[in-house]
Amino acid sequence: MSLSKKKEEPWYIELPKTIFWAVGIAIVFRSFLFEPFSIPSGSMIPTLKVGDYLFVSKYSYGYSRYSLPFGIIPFSGRVMESTPERGDVVVFRKPGAEHIDYIKRLVGLPGDEISVTGGILHINGEPVKRVQVTQGLVDIGLVIQQAKIYEETLAEGRTHLIQELSDQNSMDNTVPVTVPEGHYFFMGDNRDNSRDSRAEVGFVPAENLIGRAEFLFFSHNGKASFFEVWKWPFAIRFDRIGKSID
């Protein structure tokens, strides 16, 4: 009794099948598990830097229509929903401009009263503790300016670093606002250089959340182009690769 050898398919059939499965697996991975994002601005300095690349867990808060590519399955709300925690670094779609992704820190939960006085965040009338850890000169584009780094401690005990150029800039004093049900309030860690819920972004609906930022998988300082291979070892921030995002 002889075994017949399975006939191999021609390459022009095998190749499209391989591409189809590869694309399908990538879509499932990005839609339901982890999606990569890059950091284009300094609004989350010192936590995240321009040139950082990170993975966002899509399953952390459940799924909405924005979890899928191009919103191909339109539905409202979230399925398998899980409540985010104060202090999470979150990627979300900007309200009113849902084609734009933002990444900020969640500071206000539904029902919270949020305000900023003299640069200090207040939650439900209580000032959030912050302690200065360092200061130095930073490049903010056209000028070099003195900045202070603080460690901020939320009521739940979670800590993170923030950067302040001054305590009297345009968004360092805001009127108290109450976060509506089904919405969240976000701020950038670079408090004087962030478009967030204090202005422009406003309250973010729960269905606009994409996921929680987890860890960096790559980082570079932008000082080497794709073709300047000899500069890559000096442009890559090896100390940031694999760093978790707190």
Regions found by a protein language model. Name each.
Residues 2-13, 28, 32-33, 37, ...:
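Soluble "head" domains of membrane/secretory-pathway proteins
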